[in-house]
């Protein structure tokens, strides 16, 4: 397992500790390109457990929209990024770096490997052609 992976709902995940099955996740820069800066984030707490694709939180963007955050793999939240709790603007400047959202302990490499790699995600983005409807609320229905 290596490299960053992406979901169709624009979350990213990377395995940061293969021995203990720990991954770091966040939202893709794509979300900001379409919706603008993030002004508020609400997320799960340490110890919460989720199935893959469940909603673990939400972001509010400058336009007033609320966008759900989905967990890419089944797992337990083990760490929250304190930087974004103190200053959500960190996500705006580095959504796929210092603006990571949380770390999860997970068990299924199958779920991880089934996600899109960088090339597949880039093709997925190109197919959407930066269409604002591309991230409408219907895409996030459970």
For each feature predicted by the language model, list its residue ranges.
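Conserved hydrophobic positions within beta-strands
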Residues: 10-13, 59, 69, 77
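Nucleotide phosphate-binding site architecture
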Residues: 57, 78, 122
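Short, charged beta-turn/beta-strand-edge "cap" motif at the junction between a beta-strand
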Residues: 55-57, 62-64, 84, 108
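Mid-chain, well-packed structural core segment of small domains
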Residues: 63-98
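Acidic, low-complexity mobile loops and tails
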Residues: 1-52, 93-120, 124-142
């Amino acid at each position: 397992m290596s490299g960053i992976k992406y979901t169709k709902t624009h979350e990213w995940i990377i395995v940061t500790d293969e021995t203990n099955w720990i991954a770091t996740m966040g939202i893709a820069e794509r979300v900001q390109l379409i919706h603008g800066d993030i002004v508020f984030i609400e997320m799960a707490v340490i110890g919460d457990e989720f199935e893959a694709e469940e909603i673990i939180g939400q972001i509010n963007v400058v336009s007033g929209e609320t966008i759900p955050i989905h967990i890419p793999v089944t797992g337990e939240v083990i760490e929250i990024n304190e930087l974004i709790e103190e200053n959500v603007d960190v996500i705006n400047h580095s959504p796929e770096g210092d603006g990571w959202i949380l770390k999860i302990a997970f068990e299924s490499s199958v779920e991880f490997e089934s996600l899109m790699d960088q090339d597949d995600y880039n093709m997925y983005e190109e197919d959407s052609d930066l269409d604002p409807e591309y991230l409408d609320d219907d895409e996030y229905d459970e």
